[in-house]
């Protein structure tokens, strides 16, 4: 098993480490996600939206922990560390448009039968998030994927190693 190290640009020291997954562990995690996705997608849209927004709110409550962590991981000055406003706004917007964006699209050119396009969850959405705005860029794909009934496998940049942990702890 290999170790991933986040080296702080502030002092050149290792700030955080995480073990990589073995191939077996990665396959087990994918299977766990497949199982979880069935139950998740069976929840009503309104419930998925509520749970996603509760998670967003929980991240907001962690802001005092998150900002100094980002400063250490990325070297971003603390005064520029607050991403929660944009994070929350993006998630709220996606929640607000979800019902309309996910509704069936009716195609009517013959009154004798009904045709429509129905959006269905894909399953597992793999998100590779960049380091520069690690929360705001991640929520752009995580929120719509979860709201639509998918589950997410998240891989963050090495330089923002702890962001994924913050997101899974909510």
Give names to the regions the model predicted.
Residues 106-168:
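Conserved small-residue-rich beta-alpha loop and adjacent elements
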Residues 1-113:
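N-terminal Rossmann-like NAD(P)+-binding subdomain of aldehyde/semialdehyde dehydrogenases
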Residues 12, 48, 145-146, 170:
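Hydrophobic alpha-helical segments that mediate membrane insertion or helix-helix packing
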């Amino acid at each position: 098993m290999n170790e991933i190290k986040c080296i702080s640009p502030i002092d050149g020291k290792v700030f955080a480490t995480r073990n990589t997954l073995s191939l077996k562990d990665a396959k087990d995690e994918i299977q766990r996600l497949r199982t979880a996705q069935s139950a998740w997608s069976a929840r009503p849209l309104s419930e998925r939206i509520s749970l996603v927004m509760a998670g967003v709110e929980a991240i907001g409550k962690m802001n005092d922990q998150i900002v100094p962590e980002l400063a250490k991981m990325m070297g971003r000055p603390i005064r520029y560390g607050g991403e929660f406003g944009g994070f929350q706004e993006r998630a709220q917007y996606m929640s607000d448009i979800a019902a309309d964006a996910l509704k069936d699209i009716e195609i009517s050119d013959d009154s004798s039968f009904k045709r429509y396009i129905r959006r269905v969850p894909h399953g597992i959405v793999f998100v590779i998030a960049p380091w520069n705005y690690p929360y705001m860029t991640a929520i752009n794909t995580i929120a719509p994927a979860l709201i639509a009934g998918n589950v997410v496998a998240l891989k963050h940049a090495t330089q923002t190693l702890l962001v994924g942990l913050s997101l899974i702890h909510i």
